[in-house]
């Protein structure tokens, strides 16, 4: 951590690395419009407070997707442990919605949209090893 910014974010300079720990997202198209999110823990929100929901909504709104989607999120990454579990789930949702509805977005396109969900979500779209600076974007 380099410093705390006036907007509440921390300015960072760090190496980020993906690891073999993951949650499971399963997506299916629905004929009824909307986002139907089910999570395996009752204390995790399944509405617009959830980053998976936000990611799905972001793309579905932008591309005016008329169908709905059913998303099942099974959490294995510890919640609020600083391991980017929510961010990686959001990234997976972006990739999944892009594929499911054949939106044709590239990885770069997804990364550009991902920053609207969270600072480290673009990295989670990219995966691998990266130097993160600024607020982590």
Task: Identify what each model region corresponds to.
Residues 1-81, 99-108:
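ATP-binding N-lobe of GHMP and related small-molecule kinases
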Residues 53-54, 91, 112:
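A broad detector of short, well-ordered amphipathic alpha-helices
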Residues 58, 96, 112-116:
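Generic structural signal for isolated residues within well-ordered alpha-helices
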Residues 87-101:
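Short, small-residue alpha-helix embedded
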Residues 104-137:
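Alpha/beta catalytic cores of group-transfer enzymes, especially the acyltransferase/condensing modules
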């Amino acid at each position: 951590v380099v410093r705390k910014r006036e907007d509440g974010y921390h300015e960072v300079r760090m190496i980020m690395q993906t690891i073999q720990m993951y949650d499971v997202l399963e997506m299916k198209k629905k004929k009824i419009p909307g986002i139907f999110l089910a999570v395996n823990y009752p204390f995790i929100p399944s509405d617009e407070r959830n980053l998976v929901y936000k990611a799905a909504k972001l793309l579905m709104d932008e591309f005016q997707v008329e169908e709905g989607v059913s998303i099942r999120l099974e959490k294995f990454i510890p919640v609020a442990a600083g391991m980017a579990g929510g961010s990686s789930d959001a990234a997976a949702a972006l990739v999944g919605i892009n594929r499911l509805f054949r939106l044709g977005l590239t990885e770069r396109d997804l990364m550009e949209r991902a920053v609207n969900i969270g600072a480290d979500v673009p990295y989670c779209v990219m995966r691998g090893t990266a130097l993160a600076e600024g607020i982590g974007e």
